[in-house]
Structure formats: C-alpha cells, structure tokens
Amino acid sequence: MPKFKTHRASAKRFKRTGNGGLKRSHAYTSHRFHGKTKKQRRQLRKSGMVSNSDMRRIRQMLSGLK
C-alpha cells in the first residue's frame, strides 16, 4: 500500500500545538478593513484553533507532519 502524502497547501496553513491541537489564522484579513470595526481587526490578528468537527479531516491531510 502506498504511503500517504502530506497535503502541502494545508501544511503551510496549520501548525500543531503542544497538546496535539491545530492552530490556524483567521480569514478576512488581507484587505477591505474599512468595513470592519477596530475590535474586529484586533481579534482577527490573533490565531484560532481548528474545531473538533474539522480535526479528523485536517489531521488526515497533515498525516506526514510531525
């Protein structure tokens, strides 16, 4: 049976945390900030965590990462 390959686009977007979670960055942060409040922009700068419902699928894409 062939080895699983890491999905390279996903590997660039997610980082593993110490407890085995996955860290991600928020969407809507590249342009068009004039429609967002100061609070929204500040909160979008912080990283988020991958939800439990998406975790299994993303872990499978990142199977080759340590």
From Swiss-Prot:
Top-level division of the source organism's lineage: Bacteria
GO molecular-function terms, A-Z: structural constituent of ribosome
TM regions (residue ranges): none
Region (Disordered): 1-66
The keyword Ribosomal protein appears for this protein: yes
Record's compositionally biased regions (Basic residues): 1-16, 23-45
GO biological process, one term: translation
Keyword ATP-binding: no
GO cellular component: cytosolic large ribosomal subunit
Database matches in InterPro entries: Ribosomal_bL35, Ribosomal_bL35-like, Ribosomal_bL35_CS, Ribosomal_bL35_sf
Pfam families documented for this protein: Ribosomal_L35p
Family: Belongs to the bacterial ribosomal protein bL35 family.
Protein name: Large ribosomal subunit protein bL35
Encoding gene (name): rpmI
